[in-house]
Amino acid sequence: MRSLKQKKYRKKYRNFVVEGVRSIRSAFEDRAQFESIFFRDNFDTERIPQLKQVDRNIIYRVSDNTMKKLSNTSAPSGILAVSKLPEYKQFCPDENAIYLDGISDPGNMGTIIRTASWFGVQQVILSKECID
């Protein structure tokens, strides 16, 4: 799982890490295919009701120390998951789209995608130089 911090391994294994309550809730809403879900011993699973629908074989309760090792953040929220990369649909010239080039900050990318979604943009196309 640690290798998924690098873009080449995310591409190779077709997996990525989703971290935090809000992001995992959103992934559930988007019908993400989870490979594994990790949460700290003291994490309140009621915060994400969809966890009740997940195969118990992919859910792992871990110590704070293990969560810190798995997390990409300095202050882990207590839950993270490994999910399959979604299949991208073919470009459709009849739908509105934006093209992004050279976006390297994950926070900026998220803001742009959320804003585009709010404006009804249906396709986001990324250059190879963009963060994935």
Where are these regions (language model features)?
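Glycine/small-residue-rich loop that forms an oxyanion/phosphate-binding "nest" at active or ligand-binding sites
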Residues: 52-84
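Glycine/charged-rich beta-loop-alpha catalytic/anionic-binding loops adjacent to active sites
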Residues: 7, 61-62, 93-98
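A short, well-structured juxtamembrane/interface segment
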Residues: 21, 87-89
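Structural motif
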Residues: 17, 38, 80-82, 99, ...
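RNA substrate-binding interface of SAM-dependent RNA methyltransferases
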Residues: 29, 91-132
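Short connector loops at helix/strand junctions that flank enzyme active sites
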Residues: 32, 74-76, 93-95
